[in-house]
Curated annotation (Swiss-Prot):
NCBIfam families: pth. One of its GO terms (biological process) is protein quality control for misfolded or incompletely synthesized proteins. One of its GO terms (cellular component) is cytoplasm. TRNA binds at residues 17, 68, 70, 116. The gene is pth. Its EC number is 3.1.1.29. The lineage of its organism: Bacteria, Pseudomonadati, Pseudomonadota, Gammaproteobacteria, Pseudomonadales. It comes from Pseudomonas fluorescens (strain Pf0-1). Keywords: Cytoplasm, Hydrolase, RNA-binding, tRNA-binding. Pfam families: Pept_tRNA_hydro (PF01195). Its main location: cytoplasm. This is Peptidyl-tRNA hydrolase. GO terms for molecular function: peptidyl-tRNA hydrolase activity; tRNA binding.
Length: 194
């Protein structure tokens, strides 16, 4: 029952990447910040946009790395190191090709599955992969050679609405996630699909 002290939302910086599939994790953190009335502020020390709120007397930090996706670990390691946050106290929200739009799944630990942001976080945390993940389904283009353009593209409206719904589902179980009630959070989240 590990409580979460840091929520990271992966994406790429800049207007050209806003609302792209690859920025699904960043969108999740933006939605948390909005719900908690937190202003995300650029902080060069942590290579990202950061914020903080309190949940049941515990500080919860938010981070959207402003490095490019493949350097996300630089931001995560800097913030987690400074505040002495252990890998198992971190939740990383990211886009997931292996899930359809409208589906969100929680996962504890594991490999990077080809995701460059996760790959760099694992490396920068000293090859520790025990952090939690929120996998936000974006679907797969069907052909490996199309993946790069697919993740860096904007989803059609119907797909975006499903992604937004999956983020809503994840926000609904956020209190359980923050409290470390992983079984309850997984049961509730995994039973929902847009």
């Amino acid at each position: 029952m590990t409580a979460i002290k840091l929520i990271v939302g992966l994406g790429n910086p800049g207007a050209e990447y806003e609302q792209t599939r690859h920025n699904a994790g960043a969108l999740f953190v933006e939605r948390i910040a909005h719900a908690q009335n937190v202003n995300l502020v650029a902080d060069r020390k942590y290579f990202g946009l950061t914020g903080r709120f309190s949940h049941q007397g515990q500080d919860v930090r938010l981070l959207i790395p402003t490095t490019y996706m493949n350097r996300s670990g630089q931001a995560v390691a800097a913030l987690a190191g400074f505040f002495r946050i252990k890998p198992e106290e971190i939740l990383v929200a990211h886009d997931e090709l292996d899930l359809p739009p409208g589906v969100a799944k929680l996962k504890v630990g594991g490999g990077h599955g080809g995701h460059n942001g996760l790959r760099d976080i694992i490396a920068q945390l000293g090859n520790q992969n025990t952090f939690h993940r929120l996998r936000l389904g974006i679907g797969h283009p069907g052909v490996a050679s199309m993946v790069s353009n697919f993740v860096l593209g904007r989803a059609p409206r119907a797909e975006q609405e499903k992604l937004d719904a999956s983020i809503d589902f994840a926000l609904g179980v956020l209190p359980d996630i923050l409290a470390g009630e992983w079984n309850r959070a997984m049961k509730n989240l995994h039973s929902q699909k847009a």
